[in-house]
A protein has these predicted regions:
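Walker B catalytic motif
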Residues: 138-142, 149
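Helix-to-loop junction immediately C-terminal to a conserved catalytic motif
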Residues: 31
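The feature captures the beta-strand-to-loop junction immediately N-terminal to the Walker
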Residues: 16-18
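Conserved ABC transporter NBD signature motif
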Residues: 39-46, 59, 92
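Q-loop/switch helix immediately C-terminal to the Walker
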Residues: 67, 73-89
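ABC ATPase NBD coupling module
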Residues: 47-62
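ABC ATPase C-loop
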Residues: 129-130
Length: 201
């Protein structure tokens, strides 16, 4: 609804607001799942308004869904390697899984299927995005479906991604205070409009 936003490089931005305020819709517009009714979206100086999700991913935009996608026939290691775009060794793959609170040896060769819980899939997806090192990574309510201990470990993952990946940005859709606390900038959405932009203070 006439939203105008700029996400700067090297920033961790939290988008928050009450239920139904348009947070997830905005995330899907950024990723290319939905198209805006009007206006334009620019990424690295390029108009990507009419570019779909696959081509946006190729440009360097990563997205973690509220309900992670299953990849039958692929193992967890396969997915992490595909995401990274490089051949990675077992130790590297294990590190990405350990960072999100999963015991790597129990998961590395498991198929990404219905045998995994929603919380496990969520953490695997976040490990994939950490391996991908996108220019812009969007997390849509990453806390959904995971326990408190796992959520605390995710905070550390976001901080690590933020500190290690230069010239890139992270956008997290969330109302969790711990996420707002680590954000460089907070965008408050209310009824589909930007109500405020600034730091938590």
């Amino acid at each position: 609804d006439n939203i105008s936003l700029k996400i700067d490089n090297s920033k961790l931005v939290a988008i928050t607001g009450p239920n139904g305020s348009g947070k997830s819709t905005l995330a899907k517009i950024i990723m290319g799942i939905l198209k805006p009714d009007s206006g334009s979206i620019f990424f690295d100086g390029k108009d990507i308004t009419n570019i779909g999700i696959t081509d946006r991913a190729k440009l360097g935009i990563g997205f973690a869904f509220q309900q992670p996608v299953k990849f039958k026939g692929l193992t967890v290691r396969d997915l992490i390697e595909l995401s990274s775009g490089n051949t990675i060794n077992v130790s590297e793959a294990c590190n990405y899984l350990s960072d999100v609170g999963l015991c790597a040896k129990d998961y590395l060769n498991r198929e990404v299927s219905n045998s995994l819980s929603g919380g496990e899939l969520k953490r695997i997806e976040i490990a994939m995005l950490a391996a991908k090192k996108s220019k812009l990574t969007v997390f849509d309510e990453p806390e959904a479906g995971i326990d408190l201990w796992s959520f605390n470990s995710l905070i550390s993952v976001f901080e690590k991604m933020h500190s290690e990946i230069s010239d890139s940005s992270i956008v997290i859709i969330s109302h969790q205070e711990k996420i707002l606390n680590i954000a460089d900038e907070i965008i408050l959405l209310v009824d589909g409009k930007v109500q405020a932009v600034g730091q938590k203070e």
